[in-house]
């Protein structure tokens, strides 16, 4: 049986039935009804949003890279809203470990670097 480090650490991923909206500087930078929520012991739930539901024109890739033994190597982006730049506020595991493959193609936002990560009923307006 293959070892599954993330599962062994109690990390789970599930579909979020709600609408998730990320705002920075009064602007919506992500809006989805297809978010995945990652749960890990001792940490807040983290929303992962499909790239196709993120305004990628507002993101600029940075040189920062980190490694997580459970998820893999993370790449980072800064958010640009007008003259404001929020450094390394977004990350993605572009080639995650096999048991975290569900988050491939998804982005996550640091809640303390954006104005809001809102969860609403799926049919709610912006």
Question: Could you describe each region identified by the protein language model?
Answer:
Residues 1-126:
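Terminal leader/tail segments of proteins
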């Amino acid at each position: 049986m293959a070892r599954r480090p993330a599962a062994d650490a109690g990390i789970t991923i599930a579909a979020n039935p709600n609408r998730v909206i990320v705002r920075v500087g009064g602007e919506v930078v992500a809006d989805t009804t297809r978010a995945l929520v990652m749960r890990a012991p001792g940490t807040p739930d983290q929303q992962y949003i499909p790239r196709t539901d993120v305004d990628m024109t507002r993101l600029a890739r940075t040189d920062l890279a980190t490694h997580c033994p459970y998820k893999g190597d993370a790449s980072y982006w800064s958010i640009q809203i007008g003259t404001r730049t929020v450094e390394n506020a977004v990350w993605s595991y572009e080639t995650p470990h096999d048991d975290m493959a569900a988050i491939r193609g998804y982005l996550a936002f640091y809640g303390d670097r954006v104005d809001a990560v809102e969860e609403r009923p799926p049919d709610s307006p912006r």
